[in-house]
A protein has these predicted regions:
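N-terminal FAD cofactor-binding segment of flavoenzymes
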Residues: 43-80
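Predominantly flavin-linked oxidoreductase catalytic cores and closely associated redox partners
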Residues: 115-253
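N-terminal Rossmann-fold NAD(P) dinucleotide-binding loop
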Residues: 17-18
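Glycine-rich FAD pyrophosphate-binding loop
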Residues: 25-44
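Short beta-strand to alpha-helix junction loop
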Residues: 93-114, 234-238
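Beta1/beta-strand and adjacent pyrophosphate-binding region of the FAD-binding site
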Residues: 2-14
């Protein structure tokens, strides 16, 4: 049975929350974003992918993002003794934009939040309190929270959307189980005044003695993050700053690309683990963005999944039918699981072993003939399109199983 949703309360104001609010407000739906601003600015730089540019165009903010973003034509992966693997978007984007941007997260979030405000969404800077309805698979805003919203809502909103990220407010209230991945890593990140970059604008991902790192060139600095097994992070120092600074000095790769670099910011640290919620929708509630699931920062899939889920949830809300919400849930869970699979191929070494074998065999006439086709579909990993491309994923699975030519992928695994 179709339900016309006229009012929505969104918990949070991150990218997925703001994008969803903007899309719904444009449709005349009454939307409120309920969030308490962060005490500390999120320092990480975001490396966008071409698939996100399409969403920025839909929101009408591409030019604003371009004004402070660093033009990004591709990505480069360093695999130590196995060399560099550069990927240029122009080689395999097809109808998709052949570029993206690297952006400071705080400015990017402000752009999307202002977009939501311009569309008509109301922002309440409050700590929203949500309660479980006794004996039901349902939540509601507390009387205190409704009162803080003044007369914006006449009673409970038709839909409560949890976009609180890892806080996972609604899943915790409703005891919604989640599937966790096998990795338990620590991520450390900060901004440096400089770091060695092989290609201008490219995001650089590098295999380390333990774990891997990103270098995201911004307009006036470099965001450098390190992701490594938590047991190795703990050995690097007593504080996040000690751990980060020691890793820059002691890792055999990082010390070569940060010579003379100065850290400009404090170090932020979080647990990097993989989680996919088993349910994303229910009676009067839905999950979006990282609340629905998060995988890994490699390949910049997190923001892509979050913004894609926002556009798909907006479609479901406009439709209003149970089938539309179930379609949303199936689609996002499938997207998350697909990226989980892709990320695992990176960590277990199969992905870049396959790329290396392909390069080694290009003199073979058959390989030379089929290489452009294979390259186009494998390249969709880096544009963000792979998670929604069934044929590309089927080709990837085939190559991961049959395309390694007796090479041991452990040699290129992330340790």
């Amino acid at each position: 049975m179709k339900k016309q949703i006229q009012s929505v309360a969104i918990l949070g104001a991150g990218p997925a929350a703001s994008a969803l609010a903007a899309l719904l407000a444009r449709e005349g739906i009454r939307v409120a974003l309920l969030h308490r601003p962060r005490a500390a600015a999120l320092l990480v730089g975001e490396s966008l992918v071409p698939a996100i540019i399409l969403i920025l165009r839909k929101l009408g903010v591409e030019d604003e993002v371009r004004s402070y973003g660093k033009y990004k034509p591709g990505a480069i992966f360093n695999m130590n003794e196995f060399g560099d693997f550069p990927f240029t978007f122009d080689d395999f984007c097809g109808k998709m934009p052949d570029y993206a941007f690297n952006v400071p997260r705080i400015k990017f979030e402000a752009t999307l939040l202002n977009c939501a405000k311009r569309a008509g969404a109301k922002v309440f800077e409050i700590e929203a309190k949500v309660e479980r309805v006794t004996g039901e698979d349902k939540v509601r805003l507390s009387a205190e929270t409704l009162a803080a919203c003044g007369d914006f809502f006449t009673g409970q909103p038709d839909l409560i959307v949890d976009a609180t990220g890892r806080a996972r407010v609604v899943p915790k209230l409703l005891d919604i189980p989640a599937r966790e991945g096998g990795r338990k890593d620590t991520a450390l990140f900060a901004h440096l005044d400089k770091a060695e970059l092989y290609k201008s604008g490219y995001v650089h991902s590098s295999r380390l003695d333990h774990g891997w790192s990103w270098r995201i060139p911004l307009q006036d600095r470099v965001s450098l993050g390190i992701v490594l097994p938590s047991e190795h992070a703990a050995k690097a120092g007593a504080t996040p700053e000690e751990r980060y600074d020691n890793l820059l000095k002691n890792d055999s790769y990082l010390r070569t690309v940060t010579v003379g670099s100065k850290r400009l910011t404090p170090v932020m640290e979080y647990s990097n683990y993989q989680l996919v919620s088993s349910r994303l929708v229910g009676d009067g509630w839905a999950l979006v963005g990282d609340t629905a699931g998060f995988i890994d920062p490699v390949f910049s899939s997190g923001l892509l999944i979050g913004l894609t889920s926002a556009t798909e949830l907006a479609d479901a809300i406009r439709d209003g039918t149970p089938d539309a919400f179930q379609k949303y849930e199936r689609g996002v869970i499938h997207h998350l699981k697909t990226w989980h699979e892709i990320v695992n191929y990176y960590y277990d070494g199969k992905m870049f072993t396959s790329f290396r074998v392909g390069e080694m065999m290009r003199k073979n006439p058959l390989i030379r003939l089929t290489f452009p086709h294979i390259n186009k579909h494998m390249g969709r990993i880096f544009t963000g399109a792979a998670g929604k491309a069934a044929y590309s994923m089927a080709m990837m699975r085939f190559l991961m199983k049959y395309g390694l030519k007796n090479e041991d992928p452990q040699a290129m695994a992330i340790r």
